[in-house]
């Protein structure tokens, strides 16, 4: 700031008396003020800091350049003090009623003032200055009517840089300035042409359009302001020269001053110019028509922008979908049971490549191949198997287990519902054609208006015929063959043009093309040329009948595709796979269940012939731990789980705590269960912990009867439903109280085995659990009331 204070006249902030706001320049607001010590009316532009504008103004001195007085350098008050133009800006003058007084001499004088001021900046100033923001708002009118150029906030010294940033206001900006390209002094020539157009037409350039819309029109569409047809030729030629797209073809301000002088010597020009200025109503419609056309282009641009955004959104979704798919290993085939060792090797290679950034898992693919892991064995691998193969990292094991579980889940889900892919080795296909009748109705909606020039119309296509016919139409295309209209393609009804078309040209026609789906053998498409004619009555529609020959395909087996249910997959392996999946799905729920139910739930499935038989047998809700004992005992039959849960909280010495529902079992049901119970001893069951190395177990798992202990009571519940080799039921005598509890998994004492054999004889057939109790030797108290006895009649009540 000290350097600035030394080079500029410094004006104290207290030496200024501020009045109203006169407007805003670039980078600051302008106020009318009084310089008290000099008794002079001035304009003060308040700034956040002093930059290039003060440096530029300090070296300029010209009649048509605003005069610079000094700067304010008192933080936080910074500003530039210049002369005050009492008549305001040229923009305000042009858009006020005062502009109606303008004539040829007025315009020529002011056009010359601006041209001389810009010529001084470019050629006569101590340093060449490119204004870059010349517009009617930055040209002010002094008290004597002389135009002065102000607001150099966007200006630059020419020898500093020619690559400019985006500044200024778009309607006045040259195309190269809008694009932030290197500029020369002729960019001010373009802006001068816009200011001259304002003085001639007294209109706002590109009125109603936003800045970015103007930028797109000027740069991309090469649009320019409309020069009315009745404008004097000399002015029109000068404007065209100033607005050349090639900056080198634009005239310099020295040439412009010369052109203005020659125009002043033309004696016929004043009459033409004054006639043009006074007949504004005749040519104003030309400017409005141009603005309407440009707005239509802008609307079309907005519509295309929305389409591009929607397309971009769909592409992002598709990209995300492809990314997700790329993270999933590609399967050699959907028949995982038929995978060879090489197929598994390929799958593991993809898996470790996706989930391994440090290349630590790259050796695992070879481990799978060395251990002869096929598709069947892959889906049955357990944690111990992976450790035996040499995979010791817990994280890597979890990664493999998760991938194998997902592969198993997808395979079982797709087993009966395979992907809809054509099998090259399948049954031969036979072709058959069917005929679908379709009537295409072509017409157009018409708003007559006053004639063919201002009427509005749009084409449509309707259908009639078989209801299924619409499904064979792929798309409908309307081509109006108009230069400013695009070809419209629609893929779903209603098939009608979206926008109205204004005016009907001579011999106007619309080409309508209906394209059919690939299964339509003939015709592939239908083309219709519809004539558009103006009429005050409703135009007649044209009907075109079409017969579609539809190609249908079906197999020799009555059109029923092959089923995966008769696949060559190993049924025993598939059943084991299903059981493993069920066990893994319910492991979390079993880990949260009541600790009294210590027996494995899925050991009950051992020895079943099929998955359906295993599911049919228990009929137990998965979330059995959430059912209360009382409700369950009233609503379900006394299966093993119901009894185990109910009697875990009941006193077994209650008089009426027996099973009244046990008598409801029919003899046929008991016989069926008895046969099934007897037959299953001879069957080999598939152990759930079978490994992929061929460990299909034919033995059943033996388990020790569990004992639950509650305060003051002991009971023993049969595990026959859980283990076929265990006695279905037994009772506990009082002398058992003195025997030690057994440890699960340890063999019983011989005396205990003999007792268990005696208890087997007391078991009823059918797999029902039978619980007996012994009453205490003492007789009931005579003080017990009938009301208390009645309370024991309800089965399942607790006695506390």
Swiss-Prot record:
Key words of the record: Acetylation, ATP-binding, Cell cycle, Cytoplasm, Disease variant, Kinase, Magnesium, Metal-binding, Nucleotide-binding, Nucleus, Phosphoprotein, RNA-binding, rRNA-binding, Serine/threonine-protein kinase, Transferase
UniProt feature, compositional bias: Basic and acidic residues: 667-678, 728-738, 750-763, 785-800
Phenotype upon changing residue 162 to A: Slight loss of autophosphorylation activity
Reactions catalysed, as given in the entry: L-seryl-[protein] + ATP = O-phospho-L-seryl-[protein] + ADP + H(+); L-threonyl-[protein] + ATP = O-phospho-L-threonyl-[protein] + ADP + H(+)
The SAM domain, residue ranges: 339-410
Expression tissues: Ubiquitously expressed. Isoform ZAKbeta is the predominant form in all tissues examined, except for liver, in which isoform ZAKalpha is more highly expressed.
Binding sites annotated in the UniProt record for ATP: 22-30, 45
Active site: 133 (proton acceptor)
GO biological process: cell death; cell differentiation; cellular response to gamma radiation; cellular response to UV-B; chromosome segregation; cytoskeleton organization; DNA damage checkpoint signaling; embryonic digit morphogenesis
Protein name: Mitogen-activated protein kinase kinase kinase 20
Organism: Homo sapiens
